[in-house]
Amino acid sequence: MTDFDSLPHEEQLPLLLELANAALGAYDLPAGTVAKMLNLSENATYRVDAPDGRRFALRVHRDGYHSRQAIASELAWEIDLRRTGVVTTPNPIKGRDGEIIQDIAHPRMKRPRHVVLFDWETGAEPGIGEDLSGPFEVLGEITARMHIHARQW
């Protein structure tokens, strides 16, 4: 059996989806909850839809990209940004074991992957040709607040 890392990209995607759906079992979610890939870059990001109408985002971290400690530090900062009202960040969801970061194994992958489930944050992509000067002004203000927070954190 070919190792995950040696597989072509198009053969890795279904295995990542298997891992994402397996990860849902680590959380208190109803049967029938499913993941659907949204994006693949450094990490794989999935939209998770529960049959009761709740929606989440699941992040499957790329193997070896960030340590568990680095992910925990990022999450602690995101939680504090939200708590202090600096910026709205997605709320991470604790697993059944009480931990935010879950380690999920797949038989075709060398090591378990770090996985984090977040509450869904609604939004919309800008339209093609849309004037983005207003949204970028807001983004600049948010970035400034985050910079100040990071210097004091």
For each feature predicted by the language model, list its residue ranges.
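Generic, low-specificity signal for short hydrophobic/alpha-helical stretches with a mild N-terminal bias
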Residues: 2-6, 27-30, 40, 60, ...
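Juxta-kinase regulatory segment immediately upstream of eukaryotic protein kinase catalytic domains
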Residues: 1-35
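ATP-binding glycine-rich phosphate-binding loop
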Residues: 27-50
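Generic hydrophobic secondary-structure packing signal
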Residues: 16-19, 41, 70, 139
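Short hydrophobic/aromatic-rich motifs at helix boundaries and adjacent loops
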Residues: 14-18, 47-51, 114-116
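ATP-binding pocket architecture of kinase catalytic cores
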Residues: 51-153
